[in-house]
Amino acid sequence: MKHERLAVLFVFALPACSTTPPAPYDCAAPPTLSGVVRVDNPIPNRYIVVLKRAPGGPQIAASVAARFPQATNVTTFANALSGFSATMDASAAAAIARDSQVAYVQEEGRKTIGPPREGQSTQAAVPWGLDRIDQRELPLDRKYEPGATGAGVHSYTIDTGLDKNHPDFAGRVGEGFSVFGGEPIDGHGHGTHVTGTIAGTTWGVAKEATIHAVRVLDSEGSGTDSNVIRGVDWVTGHVRANGWPTVANMSLGGSVSPALDQAVCNSIAAGVTFAIAAGNDNLNACNYSPSRVKQALTLGACDERDSTARFSNTGGCIDLYGPGVDVESAARGGGSRVLSGTSMASPHAAGTAALCLARHPGPPDAVAACVVDNATPNTLNGVGSDTPNKLLYAKEP
């Protein structure tokens, strides 16, 4: 099981050309890295330091950082990654990479958001995406009856924040987090739309799940690897402290970032089931993070005619497809808007994972298997031979 470069909503740098076939990031057998790891379009003088030991508290990373006074603006990670991000020059990064407690130092990448491509509401009684995932075949029957609501499950949206006052979320918004301080208020709208698809009363798959907003992107939709890791880190600690059944959605991504992939893996190991957007470049999803994480659920996008979206990424890192073209969901400030992208497909899977958890509580591998094994096979048009032909299905078999 396995990002989204949101062709429609997120625009990230393309990965560098390589003759090496792209492969998933396997949490069970991660790559051995050392020295300074390069990324595409790095932020000057910004690095992420990953320690050799497992996550165990911020004091460990802080003690390592303290030995290098040339590292400034230090932010430590405690739960999903053992390490810290900091500002330093290349020589300091190389020196820290040689420290006996350091596994590797990674350049920090940048993420930027582009203008959304919007569609028009069909004013259907049931959004077509919900209608499609509770039946095996077309035509749509204008109903959504999945047989579960996701009650008792907690859903975390790692994104631009949330309009918590939208009536679609009334009474179900739990504690959130923002890397910018204060409440995770959505200044863009993307996170609100995504959350509406996961768990909104009107547009949501799991209509009674509890919602947690995790803001890692600013109001322009811009973020960094370290800010996204901070979000994953917070989710991991919050879930450990509370012990409740959890799904998380990441409708974001960019070029390969081993540190981010490692953080997602550690969060999965802590009990969080992740759904991740595959990306919208019509390229191989294994070239992006965190869509290449094998143990997460990575979603491509399809339309209401069961055709794959022309923008959707492809390849073996995709687990299955979900509705991602002209998807109606909650809008910041109230009402709804219609958007397209694998950003829209992924939350359908996060909601379906919440339904699986509500029916049969279990660890992330069992939840992911519930989602993938229950998918409708060989019903989509335009799927390449290197990509699974599976369509999300939300009902219990």
Where are these regions (language model features)?
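C-terminal motif of bacterial Sec signal peptides marking the signal peptidase cleavage site
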Residues: 14-16
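Protease zymogen maturation seam
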Residues: 18-40, 63-76, 81, 98-154, ...
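C-terminal subdomain of the subtilisin-like protease fold in secreted/lumenal serine endopeptidases
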Residues: 34-37, 73-75, 209, 213, ...
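Structural recognition of the beta-strand scaffold that forms the well-ordered cores
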Residues: 48-50, 85, 154-157, 196, ...
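Subtilisin-like serine protease catalytic core
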Residues: 125-126, 142-175, 182-227, 241-247, ...
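Active-site glycine-centered loops adjacent to acidic/histidine catalytic or metal-binding residues
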Residues: 159, 279, 341
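Short pre-catalytic strand/loop immediately N-terminal to key active-site residues, enriched for Gly-Thr
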Residues: 178-189, 308, 332-344
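The feature captures the short pre-catalytic strand/loop hairpin that immediately precedes
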Residues: 303, 322-349, 378-379
